[in-house]
């Protein structure tokens, strides 16, 4: 038997999605094969400090992983002298939100010369920005909800004018979203001007730019995409899943996702006609390719109830891995077990790392 690969499981972080990361990390830790990998859990607290854990100390943590314990060891940083602070060949990031999904972490790991799971700097940065992702995803005629952008730098008068303009153009209700955040953090459904003003103020607490979009009446659809292990092969796309929200919030809010998930139904496979299913799969594969994604992504759509018209919602280049997260659930239903999915993602990461290592960087 070959020697286990040293693998860092990185979780936590300075982000509004910190708690989600702890839950995802517990699920990944549970499904990683300890005979294949020597797992080194490293947590990042909300102040940005790193803490190393012993794998065996966390095995009993089934719901979420701790950030600091009596047995954890503080690290001076993730890197020391430009290299990873621990002896590991690959990093599996299970961190969400700005700094972690937007290319910053990916760039840091590339500078350190270490392999990492998931999308690279470019695709992570594009995918994290809802505006930029939509611009590229919709270049060939695919639609998204109409929206307008508002900057944190807008003064009170400009914000008020913006709110009146979007309400006049799009009507009610409206959705307010931070441009570069996930897990429905900072997202609000506004049914009137008072709610819109409050939603805008709250969303701007989380991001420098927000978008306000029209409400699309329709079904909420998600697909998981996995890079092909065959070089230049087409991305693999899972069967189609649907989210049905029965929560009082009226949409797939943070509360509906994680705190009161029993009021949300994840339907796999979604009940769609064959033509619509194929259109969605092709759209998901195309978007994965347009954004030059690597490893994995989850692509979300809305489908109009009456016309069956497809609207791109967003792409998540570092999707959740909790026990209720759609990405692993979709692949399990499609035929790839959770541990096998993790193995595939790690193998893909090693392939990309090996490619980068063979690039010429000396021009003399």
Swiss-Prot record:
Mg(2+) 2 binds at residues 314, 316. It holds the Pfam family Dala_Dala_lig_C. GO terms for cellular component: cytosol. Signal peptide: none annotated. GO terms for molecular function: ATP binding; D-alanine-D-alanine ligase activity; metal ion binding. Its cofactor is Mg(2+); Mn(2+). This is D-alanine--D-alanine ligase.
């Amino acid at each position: 038997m070959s020697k286990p690969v040293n693998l860092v499981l990185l979780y936590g972080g300075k982000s509004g999605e910190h708690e989600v990361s702890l839950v995802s990390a517990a699920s990944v830790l549970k499904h990683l094969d300890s005979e294949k990998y020597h797992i080194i859990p490293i947590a990042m607290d909300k102040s940005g400090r790193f803490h190393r854990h012993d794998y065996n100390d966390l095995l009993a943590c089934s719901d979420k992983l701790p950030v600091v314990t009596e047995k954890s060891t503080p690290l001076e940083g993730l890197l020391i002298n430009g290299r990873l602070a621990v002896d590991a060949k690959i990093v599996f990031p299970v961190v969400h939100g700005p700094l972690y999904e937007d290319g910053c972490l990916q760039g840091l790991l590339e500078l350190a010369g270490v392999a990492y799971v998931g999308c690279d700097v470019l695709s992570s940065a594009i995918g994290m920005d809802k505006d930029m992702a939509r611009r590229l995803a919709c270049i060939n005629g695919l639609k998204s909800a109409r929206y307008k952008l508002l900057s944190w730098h807008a003064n009170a008068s400009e914000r008020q004018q913006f709110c009146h303009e979007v309400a006049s153009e799009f009507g009610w209700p409206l959705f307010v979203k931070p441009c570069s955040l996930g897990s429905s953090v900072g997202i609000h459904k506004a049914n009137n001007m008072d709610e819109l003003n409050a939603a805008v103020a709250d969303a701007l607490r989380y991001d420098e730019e927000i978008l306000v979009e029209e409400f699309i009446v329709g079904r909420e659809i998600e697909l998981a995409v996995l890079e092909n292990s065959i070089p230049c092969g087409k991305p693999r796309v899972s069967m189609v899943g649907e989210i049905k929200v029965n929560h009082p919030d009226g949409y797939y809010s943070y509360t509906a996702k994680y705190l009161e998930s029993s009021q949300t139904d994840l339907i796999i496979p979604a009940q769609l006609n064959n033509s619509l299913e194929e259109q969605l799969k092709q759209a998901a594969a195309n978007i994965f390719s347009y954004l030059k994604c690597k490893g994995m992504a989850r692509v979300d759509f809305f489908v109009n109830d009456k016309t069956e018209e497809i609207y791109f919602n967003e792409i998540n280049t570092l999707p959740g891995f909790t026990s209720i997260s759609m990405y692993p659930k979709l692949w399990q239903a499609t035929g790839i077990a959770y541990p096998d999915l993790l193995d595939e993602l790690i193998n893909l990461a090693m392939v990309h790392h090996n490619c980068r290592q063979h690039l010429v960087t000396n021009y003399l």
